[in-house]
UniProtKB/Swiss-Prot annotation:
Coiled coil: none annotated. It holds the Pfam family Ldh_1_C. One of its GO terms (biological process) is malate metabolic process. It comes from Moritella japonica. Keywords: NAD, Oxidoreductase, Tricarboxylic acid cycle. Catalyzes the reversible oxidation of malate to oxaloacetate. InterPro entries: L-lactate/malate_DH, Lactate/malate_DH_C, Lactate/malate_DH_N, Lactate_DH/Glyco_Ohase_4_C, Malate_DH_AS, Malate_DH_type1, Malate_DH_type1_bac, NAD(P)-bd_dom_sf. This is Malate dehydrogenase. GO terms for cellular component: cytoplasm. One of its GO terms (molecular function) is L-malate dehydrogenase (NAD+) activity. The lineage of its organism: Bacteria, Pseudomonadati, Pseudomonadota, Gammaproteobacteria, Alteromonadales.
Length: 312
């Protein structure tokens, strides 16, 4: 199993690479790529960690060598948010980066599963899809927007609020991956009751948690370490599913035939070909149903923006 990380020299990429080096199954290959000259050195640094995962690093303008034979490609390349920016401010820079890297994946590893971390995910995933379609290699089962950070934040905040073990907390998160498009389904957390006030406080905290980190870092970065952990959780789940482990479910932003939008995050059963089955997200509370309906205009506009970017 070969996993490639594109954008591996950045804050998310390095955290993700560390977790993959220590947690990928024995015999896996890990390939790191970034335009930054430091990238081969990041690989050398990680190579000193004693695990049965081989690692190589590549720098420069062409990721081809990193992508040859890749089964999974995780893309975190791009610029990060700074105070005062929202995810849409990132669009002009990151859209072009994703377009180029998706094109390289189409050319070098057309059968790989691709997980997009680069924001704005609501838009960068449709960009990748359009590029893959133009190349004639699009398989909607193999393209994912990694929204796992919204899930782990939800689990953490619920655990803290209710004083319960994280082992007992599962929170499905549907919709998209920015602001009001992030919808944690708190009504579905088993064994936990929330007051209307708790839901009204917790939901926006989850939606705006990225801004909380950006502001706390005072211009020194965005959520890199927690995002690295979230991407590793998703990537490792995907690897296990590709290797035949059954029953692995993660929430992710996919082209899954949703009645709401072309791309929509919801629980997905992963399998040997990527998406095995898009699962129903169950019954919503009145608050959640209203929030879902209210987000759709923004989510659809984000998707259209990506499609039109590739169409030119």
């Amino acid at each position: 199993m070969k996993v490639a990380v594109l954008g591996a020299a950045g804050g998310i990429g390095q955290a993700l690479a560390l977790l993959l080096k220590t947690q990928l199954p024995a015999g896996s290959e890990l390939s790191l790529y970034d335009i930054a000259a430091v990238t081969p050195g990041v690989a050398v640094d990680l190579s000193h960690i004693p695990t049965d995962v081989t690692i190589a690093g590549f720098a420069g303008t062409d990721p081809t060598d990193a992508l040859v034979g890749a089964d999974v490609v995780l893309i975190s390349a791009g610029v990060a948010r700074k105070p005062g920016m929202d995810r849409s401010d990132l669009f002009n820079i990151n859209a072009g980066i994703i377009k180029n890297l998706a094109g390289k994946c189409a050319e070098v590893c057309p059968n790989a599963c691709i997980g997009i971390i680069t924001n704005p995910v609501n838009t960068t995933v449709p960009i990748a899809a359009e590029v893959l379609k133009q190349a004639g290699v699009y398989d909607k089962r193999k393209l994912f927007g990694i929204t796992t950070l919204d899930v782990i934040r939800s689990e953490t905040f619920v655990s803290e609020l209710k004083g319960i073990s994280l082992a007992d907390v599962e929170v499905p998160v549907i919709g998209g991956h920015s602001g009001v498009t992030i919808l944690p389904l708190l009504s579905q957390v088993k064994g936990v009751e929330f007051t209307a006030e708790e839901i009204a406080t917790l939901t926006p905290r989850i939606q705006n948690a990225g801004t909380e980190v950006v502001e706390a870092k005072a211009g020194g970065g965005s959520a890199t370490l927690s995002m690295g952990q979230a991407a590793a959780r998703f990537g490792l789940s995907l690897v296990r599913a590709l290797q035949g482990e059954e029953g692995i479910v993660e929430c992710t932003y996919v082209d899954g035939g949703s009645e709401h939008a072309t791309f929509f995050a919801q629980p997905v059963l992963l399998g040997k070909n990527g998406v095995e089955e898009v699962l129903a997200y169950g019954e919503l509370s009145e608050f959640e149903a209203n929030a879902r309906d209210a987000m759709l205009e923004e989510l659809k506009a984000n998707i259209t923006l990506g499609e039109e970017f590739v169409a030119g």
